[in-house]
């Protein structure tokens, strides 16, 4: 069995990313922010407090995103796939809001929060730094991404009890369900 088959490749690649972000943060006290951070580009983010508040409270209306926020707030941890989905949704994927409040939310709730790694990932996913070296040009559709990682909707139903009885074909986009289904 080679390293890729037993997971060694994945572990090593994640360690390399961690070290990359540690190196990039060295001697940069402003690494966890945009404005004074010399490696960040100036992105003209929107400033819509209502959208930020909905995101922070897991009430965006996008079940996979809301489940991720609620899991993080309840348990102090979320899978890296969910972290990336949340980061992309807040920034360049959907809301086009500054990544700094998302970074602060992660650091407040994630028990494994790491200043350099968390900041680095937010900069990467938001495309405010590292774009050429890390190629983060794709975007995730929050209604499709959940299907890819959890086709049965178990994750959403666990963290969004209001959707526990929603038929699986509508769990990631409940607004598409017929009215009689939504009223149940």
Predicted features along the sequence, with ranges:
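C-terminal catalytic domain of photolyase/cryptochrome flavoproteins
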Residues: 1-184
